[in-house]
């Protein structure tokens, strides 16, 4: 009986995040490359997901989305106010501002949408507002709480990636 209560309590504690779009790997290291997946666990009620649009935070300059078989991929760019040095001597003049996957994901299935990116040198919370469009309806996962520790309290929180300080002697690869 106690095991059942403990399991039920654990399930209840995790319930608020069950329906949110989340990063499968919720932490990365400042100044390093991060490859992770945004997990979409349901549609809009019984309606299939047909598009996922993810906004990329301004501090992230290098992003490469992962293509998905059967889905189309669109990448939106925004010019930088001032060019910055990039990898291998290149100059970065624009950044990826949004990634949009279009396809079909039945409401009773889940999938993951991959992003590889160079994280900023500063630690802290990065939010990736996402709009999940369905055959009927949509979910706007765009709420950014004033306090990252209160993320789970938001009804429709933007996916969050926590950037941890770089380890001493860390070199980005």
Residue ranges, per PLM feature:
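N-terminal edge beta-strand
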Residues: 18-40
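Short, solvent-exposed loop/turn segments enriched in Ser/Thr/Gly
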Residues: 31-36, 111, 125-127
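Extracytoplasmic/periplasmic copper-protein system
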Residues: 30, 133-173
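Low-complexity, serine/threonine/proline/glycine-rich extracellular segments that form mucin-like
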Residues: 33-69
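A surface/secretory-pathway sequence property marking extracellular, secreted
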Residues: 60-94, 159-168
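Low-complexity, intrinsically disordered segments enriched in Ser/Thr together with acidic residues
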Residues: 96-124
């Amino acid at each position: 009986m106690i095991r059942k209560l403990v399991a039920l309590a654990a399930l209840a504690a995790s319930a608020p995040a069950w329906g949110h779009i989340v990063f499968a790997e919720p932490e990365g290291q400042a100044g390093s490359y991060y490859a992770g997946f945004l997990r979409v666990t349901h549609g809009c009620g019984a309606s299939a997901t047909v598009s996922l649009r993810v906004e990329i935070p301004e501090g992230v300059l290098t992003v490469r989305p992962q293509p998905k078989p059967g889905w189309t991929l669109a990448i939106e760019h925004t010019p930088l106010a001032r060019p910055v040095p990039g990898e291998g001597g290149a100059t970065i003049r624009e950044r990826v501002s949004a990634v949009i996957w279009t396809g079909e994901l039945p409401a009773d299935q889940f999938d993951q949408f991959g992003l590889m990116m160079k994280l900023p040198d500063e630690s802290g919370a990065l939010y990736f507002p996402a709009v999940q469009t369905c055959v009927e309806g949509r979910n706007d996962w765009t709420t950014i709480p004033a306090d990252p520790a209160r993320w789970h309290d938001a009804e429709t929180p933007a996916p969050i990636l926590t950037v941890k300080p770089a380890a001493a002697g860390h070199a980005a690869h």
